[in-house]
Structures are given as C-alpha cells and as structure tokens.
Amino acid sequence: MARIAGVDLPSNKRIVIGLTYIFGIGKTSSQNILKKAGIDESIRVKDLSDEHEAAIRRVIEESYQVEGDLRSEVNLNIKRLMDVGCYRGFRHRRGLPVNGQRTRTNARTRKGVKKTVANKKKATK
C-alpha cells in the first residue's frame, strides 16, 4: 500500500484510479501526473517501485495543491465570502444553496432535515 500526500492508496487498484483517492486529484489530473512522471496508467499500486512513488510525489508537490492545503484554502475562500458580506457569503452563512438553485422544493441536502412549522389554530365562534 503506497502512501502519497498523507493518503494510503488502495493496493489492488490501478494507479490512475488510486491517485484519485487524494483530495484535489481527479481522473484527468491523475493521468497528467502519470504522464509527467513517465509511468504507465495500467500499473497496479502494489506493483509500484520506490522510484515510481518518488516521481509521483515530486510531480504532485511541484504542480498540485492537495489535501490539507487545498481544504484550508477552500475554507478560507468561503470565510472570506462570508466576511465580505456578499450574496454568496450570505447563502453559505444561512446554509442554503449558493449557485442559484431553487429552494421552494428540493435543496434538502443543503438545508438539512425538514423542520415542521406548527399551524395556528382558528378561533371557534
């Protein structure tokens, strides 16, 4: 099991898929990393040599922001939006969808479980 950027890659998967377990690296980025490092995409993680691992680490450190650094940058960007007081920051603060999606129905993932509102009872005559 190879450990790259603080993440244990699953040893039975191909390296092109294994690299996507790192936050900030998708399939295309993974393919580009392997191309720069000169490693075949079909190699399994368990078959990687130490030189291959070192080459992958070097390419990732030079060219990509991954894991903790990327997470903290994303959180700082969201915090900046909230501090500035813009519309997107307001939506983040309220826990609502940010990119213009409808909220009359749906948006359950962002809003959370329904909060039932009690009806006022009508006065009887």
UniProtKB/Swiss-Prot annotation:
MF GO annotations: rRNA binding; structural constituent of ribosome; tRNA binding
Keywords from the named record: Ribonucleoprotein, Ribosomal protein, RNA-binding, rRNA-binding, tRNA-binding
UniProt keyword Iron-sulfur, yes or no: no
GO terms for cellular component: cytosol; small ribosomal subunit
Keyword rRNA-binding on entry: yes
Gene Ontology BP, a term: translation
Entry-linked InterPro entries: Rbsml_uS13_C (IPR027437), Ribosomal_uS13 (IPR001892), Ribosomal_uS13-like_H2TH (IPR010979), Ribosomal_uS13_bac-type (IPR019980), Ribosomal_uS13_CS (IPR018269)
One Pfam assignment: Ribosomal_S13
Gene3D superfamilies with a match to the protein in the record: 1.10.8.50, 30s ribosomal protein s13, domain 2
Region annotated Disordered, chain positions: 95-125
Quaternary organization: Part of the 30S ribosomal subunit. Forms a loose heterodimer with protein S19. Forms two bridges to the 50S subunit in the 70S ribosome.
Similarity remark: Belongs to the universal ribosomal protein uS13 family.
HAMAP family (alphabetical): Ribosomal_uS13
Protein name according to UniProt: Small ribosomal subunit protein uS13
Species assigned in the record: Leptospira biflexa serovar Patoc (strain Patoc 1 / ATCC 23582 / Paris)
